[in-house]
Amino acid sequence: MKHIIIVTSPEVAGRKIQRTLGLVRGNTIRARHVGKDIMAGLRHLVGGEIYEYAKLLAESREQALDRMLAEAEQLGANAVVSTRITTSVIMGGAAEMLVYGTAVVLEE
């Protein structure tokens, strides 16, 4: 995969947008693991970070981001601007991670 610039702003500082290619997105839906739920439940009782869920969310975010970048690369983009990350609960124990933005071609 080629290097694609990702920013949350609508433009890349010091670079001019030559062409806008459109919306790109990547998502993943993950379910919790029963065994990890037990450990997370115990940690919830005593306080502190719930590592099992933090790891699950980090992996989900990376997978969704990779999928968005693959879509941007297919369009010929060298940057994605206005990037956003959202999460939503799909059903009990499952959540969606969605990463989206606008694929663009920046002048070299």
Question: Language-model segments: what does each one mean?
Answer:
Residues M39-G41, I90, L98:
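Hydrophobic alpha-helical segments
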